[in-house]
Amino acid sequence: MDEALKEKTKKTAKMLFHTLKGGTGFEDWKKIDKELARELSMFFTGKLYSREVISQKQRELCAVASLTVLNREREVHAHVHAALNVGATRQEVAEVIFQQVTYGGMPVVVESLRVFKEVLEERGEWQ
C-alpha cells in the first residue's frame, strides 16, 4: 500500500469528518469488507477529495448541493459537517441548500435545512 496515499487519506478524512458523532460510513464499510473499505476510502478521500483544483470548501459545498437534490439525509449530514470544518459559513451552506429548490424542489430543500439545523445543534452553533 502506498504510505503517502494512506497518510493523505487519513489527513483528509480527519479534516473533513472529525466533528461527526457516531462515526462515518467507512466504519460500517469495514465491517462488511475491510479491504474494499480501504480501497474505497483511499480513492474517494485520498485521491478525489484531496485534489487541489478547487478548494475543499468549494468541494464540500458542491457535495451538499448534490446530496440535497438527491435527498440523501445521512450524507447531507456528513457533508454539512465537512463544509463547516473547512471554512464554509452558515450563510454559505444555507444559500447552497436554498438554491437547490430550482433543481430538486421545496421538499428536498426543507429536508436538508432540517438536517443542517441538526448539525448546528450538534456543534453547539444553533441559536
Q: Can you annotate each of these PLM segments?
A:
Residues 1-56, 85, 109-127:
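Acidic, glycine/proline-rich low-complexity segments that act as flexible tails and inter-domain linkers
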Residues 56, 60, 77:
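Glycine-rich phosphate-binding loop at the start of an alpha helix
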Residues 59-67, 96-97:
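Short, structured motif recognition centered on aromatic/hydrophobic residues
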Residues 64-72, 104-106:
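Active-site-proximal catalytic alpha-helix in oxidoreductases
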Residues 69-94:
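Mid-chain, well-packed structural core segment of small domains
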Residues 96-100, 115:
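Short acidic/histidine-centered micro-motifs embedded in hydrophobic/aromatic stretches
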Residues 99, 104-110:
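Substrate/cofactor-recognition hotspot
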